């Protein structure tokens, strides 16, 4: 409890401390880590094939008084039909590569690293890629002043085939007598259905709908360590991050049974801003033999904001063009949110007493004020 108290009320669920990889004194080191592999579904759920479904249909049709379907008179002359799970899921390739270059001398250390992850989704049409870069640098300007900078940048892209499990549910519920594609290449959908239940083609859902994100993240931190006198260390930090989040969604015109869906495109852009300015001083001293004291006092200011903008249009003449400008301007809807700026200012302190390297006493204080 004492260890987390220094971080205030927001540490009620615990604190995760992240340390960055730094260069070591000596010659430059080049390190590479990577792998390639494949992913696949470990198991498929048991569902009815076409002969089993036809037999079930005939029993229910007899009870409901529908009459048998001509093509279901002898179910076991039928093929197995469509196994939608095996149509929807695939063996997916993935690769991950990371390179790090680090080094330094007694007064300077550096570390540069880059990574790339490319992961095809087990579900067709889905996937994830991430490119990242990180740089850490610190130097001793004098024997009492050290400065440094840490930066990290990443770009992630994701194709989202499965939203709220709709495609998976459709694959489990869709009838095995529906073909994934018709002979002319179009997607198969049920046009007549005595159950009065219609499911879209999950292969169509995965391939034709656009649902993707493209996000950028930048984190930065600059710091200075000042040692004006023996035992006293003053650290000043300024840092923050910027996040750019872009969403793209498009649904083409399609219909099945009595259901008709109009084409629609939606675009969204979001920006997050976070800043932090922290200063704290730590003083270590030994007033008596086997007695060690440490006193730390600090101040931190944090502030940020969130902005968002989105737009949508319907009535596209072509499914090949997803730009908002290509939609019917009469159906345009827009929304924006400049967000609510927020800020937190904090003062904190900690006292540590060590007797004989055996008995420890710690006291922590912190106060926060927020906008």
Model-derived features: positions:
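Transmembrane beta-strand segments that form the barrel wall of outer-membrane beta-barrel proteins
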Residues: 34, 114-120, 361-369
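A beta-strand signature from Gram-negative outer-membrane beta-barrel systems
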Residues: 1-31, 94-96, 109, 115-117
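Membrane-embedded beta-strands of outer-membrane beta-barrel proteins
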Residues: 16, 99, 133-135, 220-222, ...
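Outer-membrane beta-barrel channels and translocator barrels
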Residues: 25, 94, 105-106, 142, ...
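Surface-exposed loop/interface segments of Gram-negative outer-membrane beta-barrel transport/assembly proteins
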Residues: 24-81, 121-128, 132-217, 235-345
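A generic beta-sheet turn/junction motif
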Residues: 11, 103-107, 116, 355, ...
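Outer-membrane beta-barrel initiation region
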Residues: 44, 87-91, 101-105
């Amino acid at each position: 409890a004492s260890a987390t108290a220094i971080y205030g009320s927001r540490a009620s669920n615990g604190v995760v401390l992240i340390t960055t990889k730094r260069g070591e004194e000596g010659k430059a080191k080049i390190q590479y880590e990577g792998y390639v592999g494949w992913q696949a579904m470990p198991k498929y759920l048991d569902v009815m094939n076409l002969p089993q479904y036809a037999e079930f249909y005939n029993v229910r049709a007899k009870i409901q008084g529908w009459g048998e379907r001509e093509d279901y008179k002898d179910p076991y002359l039928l093929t197995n039909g469509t196994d939608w799970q095996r149509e929807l899921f695939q063996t997916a390739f993935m690769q991950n590569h990371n390179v790090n270059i680090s080094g330094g001398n007694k007064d300077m250390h550096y570390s540069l690293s880059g990574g790339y992850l490319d992961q095809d989704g087990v579900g067709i049409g889905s996937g994830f890629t991430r490119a990242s870069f990180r740089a850490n640098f610190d130097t001793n300007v004098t024997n009492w002043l050290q400065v440094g900078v840490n930066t990290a940048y990443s770009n992630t892209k994701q194709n989202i085939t499965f939203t709220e499990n709709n495609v998976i549910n459709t694959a489990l519920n869709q009838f095995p007598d529906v073909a994934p594609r018709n002979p002319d290449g179009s997607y198969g959908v049920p046009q007549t259905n005595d159950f009065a239940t219609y499911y879209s083609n999950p292969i169509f859902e995965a391939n034709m709908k656009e649902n993707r994100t493209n996000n950028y993240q930048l984190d930065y931190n600059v710091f200075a360590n000042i040692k004006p006198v023996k035992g006293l260390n003053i650290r000043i930090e300024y840092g923050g991050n910027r996040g750019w989040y872009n969403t793209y969604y498009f649904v083409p015109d399609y219909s099945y049974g009595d259901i008709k869906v109009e084409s629609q495109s939606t675009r969204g852009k979001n920006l997050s801003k976070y800043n932090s300015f922290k200063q704290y001083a730590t003083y270590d001293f030994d007033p008596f033999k086997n007695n060690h004291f440490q006193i730390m006092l600090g101040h931190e200011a944090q502030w940020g904001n969130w902005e968002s903008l989105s737009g949508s249009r319907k009535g596209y003449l072509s499914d090949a063009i997803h730009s908002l400008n290509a939609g019917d301007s009469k159906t345009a809807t827009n929304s924006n949110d400049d967000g609510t700026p927020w800020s937190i200012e904090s003062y904190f302190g900690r006292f540590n007493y060590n007797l004989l390297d055996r008995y420890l006493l710690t006291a922590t204080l912190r106060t926060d004020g927020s906008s």
